[in-house]
């Protein structure tokens, strides 16, 4: 009887295609979330949609750090661009090298988005910079920040949202909504990047073995 050739248990090309497809999906999601972070941070810099607060330095510290622009914005977009440009690479060795680069990009995006998320949570807990009444008159400060004798209860006490800050108008609601959006979007970025690290490392580990795992021809 003629020799019967066995079918490969799994194909390296199939693995490459699957990993590359996941990379492109993550890239699209990261670009979308980076756009959300950028818009949210720009709005945080413009209370009441007026630029004079920014020019006078009367903007919440965590918003002025602009992590939504450069950390969860520009840096993540650079990484996402690399994911979107991922192509089918012939040869398992070349594929594993590409996956190592993508893993490094994923780690960088993970760190930058996690940093933005941490800054956003801090800004949310600390409260906004605003003009408020003191015993010596009106002054700029952060009246809602937690102190030794007071916790961060302003988030759960809406009566403080309109009764403490005089300017910018509605700045408490403004910051709560936008910092929540910024923190949530950057947190999702961090989760996607963490999953992408696992995805690319699996590609590195399994890339070669998937190509070598074949059934030898069996002679009758």
Where are these regions (language model features)?
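Cytoplasm-facing ends of alpha-helical transmembrane segments in multi-pass membrane proteins
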Residues: 38-45, 71-91, 109-124, 154-160, ...
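Disulfide- and glycan-decorated extracellular loop modules of small multi-pass membrane proteins
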Residues: 58-61, 94-95, 104-181
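Intrinsically disordered cytoplasmic terminal tails of membrane proteins
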Residues: 1-14, 92-95, 143, 149, ...
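A hydrophobic membrane-anchoring alpha-helix module
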Residues: 168-209
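N-terminal helical submodule of small eukaryotic multi-pass membrane proteins
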Residues: 2-107
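Short, flexible/disordered secondary-structure transition segments
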Residues: 37, 43, 50-53, 128-132, ...
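Residues within membrane-spanning alpha-helices of integral membrane proteins
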Residues: 27-34, 106-109, 113, 179, ...
């Amino acid at each position: 009887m003629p020799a019967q050739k066995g079918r490969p248990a799994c194909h390296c090309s199939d693995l490459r295609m699957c990993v590359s497809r996941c990379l492109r999906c993550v890239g699209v999601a990261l670009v979308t979330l980076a756009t959300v972070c950028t818009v949210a941070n720009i709005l945080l810099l413009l209370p009441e949609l007026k630029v004079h607060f920014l020019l006078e330095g009367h903007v919440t510290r965590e918003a002025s750090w602009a992590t939504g622009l450069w950390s969860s914005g520009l840096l993540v977009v650079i990484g996402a661009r690399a994911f979107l440009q991922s192509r089918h690479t012939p040869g398992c060795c070349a594929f594993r090298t590409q996956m190592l680069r993508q893993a490094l990009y994923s780690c960088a995006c993970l760190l930058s988005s996690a940093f933005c998320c941490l800054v956003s949570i801090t800004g949310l807990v600390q409260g906004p910079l605003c003009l408020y009444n003191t015993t010596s008159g009106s002054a700029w400060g952060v009246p809602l920040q937690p102190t030794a004798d007071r916790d961060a209860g302003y988030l759960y006490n809406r009566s403080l949202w309109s009764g403490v800050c005089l300017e910018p108008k509605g700045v408490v609601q403004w910051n709560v909504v936008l910092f929540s959006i910024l923190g949530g979007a950057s947190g999702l970025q961090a989760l996607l990047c963490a999953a992408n690290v696992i995805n690319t490392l699996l590609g590195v580990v399994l890339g070669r073995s998937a190509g070598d795992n074949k059934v030898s021809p069996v002679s009758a």
